Amino acid sequence: VALSTYKWDYAPYLLYMKRRLKERLYLPQTFVRDGVISGQVTIQFRLLRNGNVENLKMIENRGHSAFISPTLNTVRASNPFKPLPNSFPDPYLDLTWTFVYSIY
């Protein structure tokens, strides 16, 4: 996750986001059944104060392209997140996340 420095305690909120994304990650069983594949997908999106996601896009893919759709769908399934903390100083938070996959 790439963040600017803000005067708010972002660690608990980002840990919440990470848990929520992991809970909603779905990889087709064929990925596991077919053996070794790996990939890395970097996405960007804007998180509004109310927790809604906007402007979700894939910005980089390394490795197997089959991970792109599940990555984007994971964020869609997690939307909305809980609202940003009251101490967050801006109307939105731009985030960059990298999902790293290794299936053996």
Functional labels for PLM-detected ranges:
Residues V1-S4, R19-L25, R46-E60, L72-P83, ...:
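Conserved "boundary/linchpin" sites in short secondary-structure elements
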Residues L27-R33, P83-L84:
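Active-site phosphate-binding and catalytic loops of NTP-dependent enzymes
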Residues D34-V36, F88:
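A short glycine-leucine-enriched loop at secondary-structure breakpoints
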Residues V1-R20, T30-R33:
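Intrinsic-disorder/low-complexity signature in envelope-associated proteins
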Residues E60-A66:
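A short acidic/small-residue loop/turn micro-motif
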Residues V36-T42:
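Short, small/polar residue-rich loop motifs at catalytic or cofactor-binding pockets
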